[in-house]
Regions:
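A short linear-motif detector with a strong N-terminal bias
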Residues: 7-12, 93-96, 145-150
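Short, flexible loop/turn elements at secondary-structure junctions
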Residues: 31-36, 90-92, 119-122, 171-173
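Short glycine-/acidic-enriched loop or helix-start segments at secondary-structure transitions
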Residues: 41, 96, 179-181
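Glycine-rich, mobile lid/loop segments that gate access to catalytic sites or pores
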Residues: 85-87
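Glycine-rich nucleophile elbow surrounding the catalytic serine of serine-hydrolase chemistry
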Residues: 89-101
Length: 188
């Protein structure tokens, strides 16, 4: 139901609504659901052992899922738009930052690109190690993340590579889930 609520909200009040004043009302909208904890950057399946000895398999397949979805959609839409907006909020904003360069290439390098990341800030010292060891993120993505801010590192690398891309990054402490995640990162 969470995806349905989010899809409804985007369609009714967000960038996907059909209101006359919405400058994006005639755009094609592709929603990539976020669901497995790897910010759309994983290509790995990993088994973990809990403290009680039980094992669990986690499928960090976010990058693979995103690529399959977008390339399949190209059967139905133009893969070379004049303009491209890559955006996401909360956990999805991490994916927007990390995948922006990849998405630009997938859409054949449009001339007018904007990347908007909304409320995607988590400070963690070992993001690079997570991308390498846990998620097995593509090299081009993980190699730009060297600090404690995965979003900022990804956006700075995007700007250094593509100076013409417009980058917007806004953040709020009102995202309860991200605030809780940061407390967990900080205090365990």
């Amino acid at each position: 139901t969470g995806l349905n609520v989010m899809t409804y909200a985007i369609k009714e009040w967000g960038i996907g609504n059909s209101a006359e004043e919405n400058i994006l009302k005639d755009w094609t909208f592709i929603g990539v659901p976020y669901c497995n904890g790897d910010f759309h950057a994983g290509t790995n399946t990993k088994e973990y052992t809990a403290l009680d000895g039980r094992t669990k398999t986690i499928y960090y397949e976010g990058y693979n899922n995103y690529r399959k979805l977008v390339t399949k959609i190209f059967d139905y839409i133009n893969d070379s738009p004049e303009q491209l907006l890559v955006t996401g909020s909360s956990a999805g904003g991490f994916g927007a930052a990390i995948l922006a360069d990849d998405a630009i290439e997938l859409f054949n390098n449009p001339q007018d690109v904007t990347v908007h990341v909304d409320s995607s800030l988590l400070i963690k010292e070992d993001w690079h190690d997570v991308m390498v060891e846990e998620w097995k993120s593509p090299k081009a993505m993980r190699d730009v993340v060297m600090g404690d801010n995965i979003t900022l590192d990804s956006l700075v690398a995007l700007h250094q590579k593509r100076t013409d891309v417009k980058i917007l990054f806004d953040c709020s402490v009102r995202d309860f889930n991200l605030s809780q995640a940061q407390v967990f990162f900080d205090n365990g």
